[in-house]
């Protein structure tokens, strides 16, 4: 799967892309050499994904819905593990594997990060085109982190 993450990050860094559709399970696999994880995990079992990501002891950024902030788990993670949050002024658009985008996103999402951002909460402007999040917006973000 050639995600927007992979496209943008691989412009300046080596990327090891994995996906469950490739038969690679996040809970069973860890690349031999890697520095940072950026992922869009399923929106179910959020706490399990965070526990697994934290177990590596390496920086990460996971996309999660902002409604998760209402749960007790992220509050505890912000307190105990210094979880970080990259929020946007607009809703992210998600593009399906077949290239279709969804203009009717009913929820907002953020990157929930650990040991990744220069401060605990960052608010960024998200440049959105009619089709998808602008390439420049993602490129700019990944150049600054």
PLM ranges: what are they?
Residues 1-145:
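Class I S-adenosyl-L-methionine-dependent methyltransferase catalytic core
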């Amino acid at each position: 799967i050639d995600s927007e993450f992979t496209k943008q990050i691989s412009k300046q860094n080596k990327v090891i892309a994995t996906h469950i559709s490739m038969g690679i399970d996040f809970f069973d696999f860890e690349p031999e050499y890697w520095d940072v994880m950026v992922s869009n995990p399923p929106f179910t079992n959020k706490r399990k994904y965070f526990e697994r990501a934290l177990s590596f002891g390496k920086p990460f950024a996971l996309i999660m819905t902002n409604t998760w902030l209402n749960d007790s788990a992220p509050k505890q993670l912000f307190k105990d593990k210094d979880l970080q949050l990259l929020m946007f002024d607009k809703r992210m658009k998600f593009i399906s594997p077949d290239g279709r985008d969804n203009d009717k996103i009913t929820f907002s999402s953020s990157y929930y990060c650990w040991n990744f951002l220069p401060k605990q909460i960052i608010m960024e402007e998200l440049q959105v085109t009619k089709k998808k999040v602008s390439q420049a917006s993602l490129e700019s973000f990944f150049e600054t982190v």
